[in-house]
């Protein structure tokens, strides 16, 4: 897939709408008001967002999600915050490895989700990290260079 101009704000908006359809009880909001554009692979970026939302709901029991994108001189930062049970700090790095599953994960899963997230971040020349969220759960932070 080629790198094309992607409107990240619009991508997050669509992901939010689809998430509410998949999880009717979920409160999903988008923090970004300004348009954030970058060169990227839309399908891959969308996969990352959908994955973070699914993880938050299935494994963290999240009821609230906040999506955000910010652009700066350093590039673009996309964050997915949730109010779920969170991922213990000592496991935040390991869960990105293939087939790894966090000790707090509630349902069976392939354990491939976050490995795919890490792979997409790498393909975009950036990084993916799990952090503590201001909402009380987990924050997935995707930090990508704006241009490739």
Walk through the language-model features, giving the residues of each.
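Glycine-rich ATP-binding loops of the HATPase_c
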Residues: 125-131
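Short helix-loop "hinge" at the ATP-lid/N-box region of the Bergerat-fold HATPase_c
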Residues: 56-60
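Short beta-strand/loop element within the Bergerat-fold HATPase_c
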Residues: 64-74
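Short conserved segment of the HATPase_c
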Residues: 87-99
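Conserved catalytic submotifs in the C-terminal HATPase_c
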Residues: 4, 25-37, 135
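Short alpha-helical Gxxx[C/S/T] motif in the catalytic ATP-binding
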Residues: 113, 117
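Acidic ATP/Mg2+-coordinating residue in the GHKL
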Residues: 82
